[in-house]
């Protein structure tokens, strides 16, 4: 893990994804106890927080991420497909929780546009069905996110981004969850 770490100026380290991740996914299937490999690699690593950004599909890499974490943060876009996919996702989380007893989960709403009434209605529906599992913070839709990705910058390096405050609030809310 230490060989892959990229130091940043902002006081956090990254391990970026690349084309080799596809090979890693394939190679995991032939390994014994493959769902625990990431957890084992992270043991003894001295960080306050480790954030694992997984793909939304249920791959072996995603399972490894869920097995290695204490808190799964699940972004939900306020549209009908998110609502329809929640039961399948909950089934997956419950299966993983059999092996990772300490796993908790929280959802947060992302790509939210308050100008669209359907988004507000779907947000209410998500909050009603998931109750306290949905964090209060919503991440507003912001073109600066796409621009930052294209420029290989963090959102915090983008001027005039309206979602910087959203992400800061989300970070505080997540830290509070981790303390409980």
Give the location of each predicted region.
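C-terminal boundary of histidine-terminating zinc-finger modules
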Residues: 148-166
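P-loop/Walker-type NTP enzyme "switch/lid" segment
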Residues: 1-46, 149-153
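Switch II (G3) loop of P-loop NTPases
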Residues: 19, 38-65
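P-loop/Walker A phosphate-binding loop and immediately adjacent motor/lid segment at beta-alpha junctions
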Residues: 32, 90-105, 111
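Inter-motif core of Ras-like GTPase G domains
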Residues: 62-79
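Beta-strand-loop-alpha "switch" segments that mediate conformational coupling across diverse proteins
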Residues: 113, 123-153
């Amino acid at each position: 893990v230490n060989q892959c770490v990229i130091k940043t100026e902002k006081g956090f380290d990254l391990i970026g994804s690349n084309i080799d991740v596809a090979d890693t996914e394939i190679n995991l299937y032939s390994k014994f106890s493959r769902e625990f490999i990431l957890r084992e690699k992270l043991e003894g690593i001295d960080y306050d927080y480790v954030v694992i950004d997984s793909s939304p599909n249920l791959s072996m890499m995603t399972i490894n991420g869920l097995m290695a974490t204490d808190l799964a943060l699940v972004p939900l876009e306020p549209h009908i497909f998110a609502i329809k996919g929640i039961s399948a996702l909950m089934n997956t989380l419950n299966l993983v929780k059999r092996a990772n007893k300490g796993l908790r989960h929280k959802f947060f709403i992302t790509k939210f546009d308050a100008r669209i009434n359907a988004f507000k209605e779907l947000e209410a529906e998500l909050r009603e069905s998931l109750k306290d599992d949905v964090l209060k913070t919503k991440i507003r839709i912001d073109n600066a996110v796409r621009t930052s990705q294209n420029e290989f910058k963090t959102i915090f390096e983008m001027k005039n981004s309206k979602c910087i405050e959203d992400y800061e609030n989300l970070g505080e809310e997540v830290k509070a969850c981790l303390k409980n």
